[in-house]
Structures are given as structure tokens and as C-alpha cells.
Amino acid sequence: MEALVCAFSELHIREDAVSQAQGRPGHPDAPPNIYEGGLGSPQPQCPSAQGSKPKNFRLRHLRGLGLYLESHPPPTGQCESHWLGRLMAGGCLPQPEGTAWALDLPQGTLGPRNSLCSALLEARLPRDSLGSSASSSSMDPDKGALPQPSPSRLRPKRSWGTWEEAMCPLCKRTRSGALERP
């Protein structure tokens, strides 16, 4: 995520510098001051490579980055900071209606058999996508690889039910903007 934010900020800096050199304002949807010095000030290197980052560095860059992420629009009425926090954490974004999740893969297609990372990812997939039998890509201890962790040790992700689906769990606001009543 750091690399994505860094690349995005460099693109924005170059885009804005060209626009200002031609006498035009920068990106119309970009906030006027994404980081200290504003968009138009010369930045010799990527901001993440500098010694200290200004306050709200990630949040400010991700607001601009959100303009380019059409696949994850912030849910209506949900706090922007909570949506961006979830986006940075890499999960828990509600699925847009009428679309399928990208990780709907058959078992064993996530990586080589000796990859611990693929074993962890497959262990987190729902049981119905793995099949009723034991994992066919589970690793044999006699081959020298680590055994696949048992699903009982992993905490299942909390899925939003129909009642909860309409509200942001962090700020207790519904997507329509009303506060939850106790």
C-alpha cells in the first residue's frame, strides 16, 4: 500500500507541475494541500522516502487515490475516514451489488504447494468453496514444509448481516446518515 501511495503521489506531483507550467490549475477534485507545501511545490523525491511525514499523510493521499479506485466507492453515508482505514487494512469493504468477489478460486490455485502464504489464504476461504473433504493442497510434514494451520485457530471474519449491512460498525451511523438508537 505504501508503494501505491508513493507512486500515486509522484504522479499527482508531475501532473500538477505540468498543469501549473501551462497556466492551468491542478486536478479539479484534488484537495488543495495534499501534503506540506501543496501540490505545486517542487518535490525532488517520493514523500515516503523523506525523513518525516506530515500529519494525515496517508489519509490525504488516499482521499486523492479514492478518485481513481472506481471499484471501491465509499458507501453512501459511511464516514470517509473509516472507509479509507478499511481500504488501507485491506478488507471488510462491503461487496457492491451484482458483482462477484475476486477471490472465488478453486482450491490449490493460490500458489505452489510449499507456500505458507497460500496455505494461510486457503485456510481462510469458506468451507463450501474448499469442499467437504480435507484440503487437497495441505502440506505433508515429511516434505519439509509447514503443515497447514487448522481453521479452528483462525478467527473467522465477521460478516455483516442484513440488519448490520446498512450501518458503519465503527461510527454506528447508517448509510442514510442517521445515528443508531440504543
UniProtKB/Swiss-Prot annotation:
Disulfide bonds: none annotated. It comes from Homo sapiens (Human). Residues 17-53, 128-159 are annotated as: Disordered. The gene is C16orf90. InterPro entries: DUF4644. Pfam families: DUF4644. Residues 129-138 have a biased composition (Low complexity). This is Uncharacterized protein C16orf90. Residues 42-53 have a biased composition (Polar residues). Transmembrane segments: none annotated.
